[in-house]
Every structure is written in C-alpha cells, then in structure tokens.
Amino acid sequence: MTQEERFEQRIAQETAIEPQDWMPDAYRKTLIRQIGQHAHSEIVGMLPEGNWITRAPTLRRKAILLAKVQDEAGHGLYLYSAAETLGCAREDIYQKMLDGRMKYSSIFNYPTLSWADIGVIGWLVDGAAIVNQVALCRTSYGPYARAMVKICKEESFHQRQGFEACMALAQGSEAQKQMLQDAINRFWWPALMMFGPNDDNSPNSARSLTWKIKRFTNDELRQRFVDNTVPQVEMLGMTVPDPDLHFDTESGHYRFGEIDWQEFNEVINGRGICNQERLDAKRKAWEEGTWVREAALAHAQKQHARKVA
C-alpha cells in the first residue's frame, strides 16, 4: 500500500491525521490556508469589539466584552499553534495577512456604529461561526479538531452573551428597539456571507469535503444558520431585512433572498468599508510589539542556556 493509499484509507476510516503522518502537499497547503485564515479572523475580530470596551454602557457589559476580546486572542493563538504543526511559521502566515496575501473573515470589515452592533455581533456573527465551527470539531486533521472543541465551548458563551445583550435592548425603549433593528439590518446579510460563496462558485470546497477537512457545504451551513436564527429574531420582536424570506412547509426550511455577491467580492478583495483600517491597526500593533517579541525571545534563550549549563 502506498503512502497516499494509506492516507486515503485513514480518511475513509475517520482516523485523524496527525502532524507526524504522511499527507499530500495539497492537503497540507489547504489546511495552512484554512487554519491561517481562521486564526487571522480571530485576531482581526478583536478590533470591532475592542472599539467599544471603553464605551460599554455598564461596568458589567465592559467586563463581559473585555473577557470576550481576550478569548478571541486566545483562539487566534490556538489556531496559529495548530497551523505550525503543519510546518509553517506563524510569523510567516501573519505577515502574509498584513501584506494582503492571506484573507480573514469578511464580516470584520464592517464598522460597529452602535452598542447594538456589539450585541448583534455576539449573537449573529458568533452564531454563524458556531454553525461552521461545530462541524470542524470532526475535521480530519487532529490538531485543528482538538483546538475547535475548546473554541466552540467559548464561542457558545459569546453567542449567548450577545443574545442576552440584544434581549435587553428588545425589552427597552423604542429608541433601543430601533437601534437593535438597525444593527440587525446592517449585519444580517454580512453574516450570511460568512459561509463563503455558493457551492457552485466555491473552488476549494470539493477537495476539502473529499478529505473531510470540511463536513458540510457552504450552502448547507448557511441554511442551517438561517433555520436556527430566524425564530430567534422573531422572538425578539425584530424583523429579518429580507422581503423574500418565508418558511417552506414542504422542505421544512426557510427560503431567503439572493445574497449580494458583488458586495462580498468587493470586501474580500480589500475594498470594504474597514479593510484598510483593520490592516493598518494590525500593522501598527505588529511594529509596536517588536520589543515585546524580542524580549520574550531573549528571556527564552536565557532560560534555555541555564538549563543546558
């Protein structure tokens, strides 16, 4: 049996692929791309929420948001570590993101204009992430799957926190209710775009499904999110900004309108509202953090020298 046949057999038998196992170069490259983009999304995703830490309406909300942003940083580090098991350096893939050669989730290129946006990000954006990431707990690459188990537990808390914040607004004044509806109007369609292009326009999906890196198609995950979320919107007394949305009794699913794929392509190609601002912020943080990285490396080298001596 060849190495490739043994690899295919492990995939078919649902046996996790580990870093020391042989794997095709294309499998390795696909994972580096996906895990790297996932890690970048966690790190860039700190920015729109961090923007509201000092402006949160209460001390409780401030503490919750601060903890959430810290969690996102941790998720990024887990994922960079998982990517490193594939033989890449985190500095290299991070620099590719700063240079615009690797992408992150399009949702983080939209501004957070009100406090309601923060609640809606926790509820809708993290809710969409959970739908995608729960399936990744069974991805074929072991380190990625294990990282996702911990991340999904924390993301579930984030989603509940976001929904609770939205519920408080939905039970508030007319101005608060309108602020919540405005936030839903802004983030509903970008949340649907998070699952990526339609299946017939997704060049990487087929191979990822064959290798069980992905377990479901983009459209299957998007449909699951809509089915989960529309009843929650209605429970809050809000409206989904989609005149074509309706429940199909025959299929048991909600049917929704056409996504603006031109907007999606503009954003992922660097022409969104906040693309440049997000990358500028990350470049600034990287440059200003040089002394921290150098100090940490020097400390590690001293510790190693003491052990050797």
Swiss-Prot record:
Catalytic activity: phenylacetyl-CoA + NADPH + O2 + H(+) = 2-(1,2-epoxy-1,2-dihydrophenyl)acetyl-CoA + NADP(+) + H2O
Keyword list, A-Z: NADP, Oxidoreductase
Pathway in which the depicted protein is active: Aromatic compound metabolism; phenylacetate degradation
Induction: Activated by cAMP receptor protein (CRP), integration host factor (IHF) and by phenylacetyl-coenzyme A (PA-CoA) that prevents PaaX from binding its target sequences. Inhibited by PaaX.
Cofactor(s), by name: Fe cation
GO molecular function: phenylacetyl-CoA 1,2-epoxidase activity
GO biological process: phenylacetate catabolic process
Domain of life: Bacteria
Positions that bind substrate: 33, 37, 103-106, 132, 193, 202-204, 214, 218
EC numbers on record: 1.14.13.149
GO cellular component, one term: cytosol
InterPro entries (alphabetical): Aromatic_CoA_ox/epox, Ferritin-like, Ferritin-like_SF, PaaA, PaaA_PaaC
Role played: Component of 1,2-phenylacetyl-CoA epoxidase multicomponent enzyme system which catalyzes the reduction of phenylacetyl-CoA (PA-CoA) to form 1,2-epoxyphenylacetyl-CoA. The subunit A is the catalytic subunit involved in the incorporation of one atom of molecular oxygen into phenylacetyl-CoA.
Subunit structure: Forms a stable heterotetramer (dimer of heterodimers) with PaaC.
Protein name, entry field: 1,2-phenylacetyl-CoA epoxidase, subunit A
Recorded name of the encoding gene: paaA
